Amino acid sequence: MKQEIKLSKEQQEIIDSNKDTIVVSNPGTGKTTTLSLKVIKLLEDKINPEDILCITFTEKAKKEMFDAIYDYGKGKFSDADIMKINIHTFHSFAYNYLLDAGIISGDIVGNNLMRFSILNSFEQNQALNYGKDYIISTIVPKTENSIRYIKSFGITPDKIDLNKATTILEKIFDEKSSSYTIDEMKSFLKYFIEAYKEYEKSKLQAVDYSDMLLMFKEKFRGNKFQHVLVDEMQDMNEIEAEIATMVAENLFLVGDAKQAIFGFQG
């Protein structure tokens, strides 16, 4: 059992609050501890542990969160009750729901398929006047990151209008601060869309991690959790923020004061 922590008046008020709560402070100031103690307070208030969902972003952070909750709760609650608390990454939460609902088969596309599809598309279209080594080491990773980024907003290749995208590029492009010319960027934009299409086609019926979040958002028909707690909430993208709000009756978010804070309606 962890040593009793002396909380400030403000920390105690945060943990005792029954309202949607956002805790923002500098890194290393005990936000995850606050989240863990909030879970313990919910258990003390007789909240069903199965009605508590804790979300973080990596398997390592998930284990650390469980360990902290277990240590603070040891001696107060049974191991069985603590084990009933739902602790997930966003992806494992979406995966488990979709799998249990029979929406996916369990096959998840890995990173290698995306990289191969991007490279294959560039080669087939004889895209970009660069050496293959440079394309593999620099262009493919940038394309991969760009696909993941726009997909996090629910933008699939069929929703991208090349003419509109080109017009926007011309308006925002600053040649002085870019390593590429406007013509190179226009060519890349065209081939980027083709590579994105090639990747989606190559997956066939399989899904990747971004697909899982999109599918969860569209297919979720389950009951809301009474309490949803999110660690490192500044790392949430738009879809993850929507998922957190759609599955929660009450939200408790903790994060660093370095990025935009999400607003919640209601």
Give residue ranges: language-model regions.
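Accessory N-terminal region flanking or inserted into the helicase ATPase core
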Residues: 1-24, 29, 33-34, 51-53, ...
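A generic secondary-structure signal
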Residues: 13, 41-45, 72, 218-219
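Conserved helicase motor core of SF1/SF2 NTP-dependent helicases
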Residues: 29-31, 234-266
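Phosphate-binding Walker
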Residues: 30-37, 59, 64
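Walker A/P-loop NTP-binding motif
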Residues: 33-47, 247
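A short beta-strand-to-loop transition that corresponds to the Sensor-1 phosphate-sensing loop
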Residues: 39, 57-60, 89-92, 254-258, ...
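Short glycine-/polar-rich loops that comprise or flank the Walker A/P-loop
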Residues: 48-51, 83, 249-250, 256-257
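Conserved P-loop NTPase-based nucleic-acid remodeling module centered on helicase motor cores
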Residues: 51-146
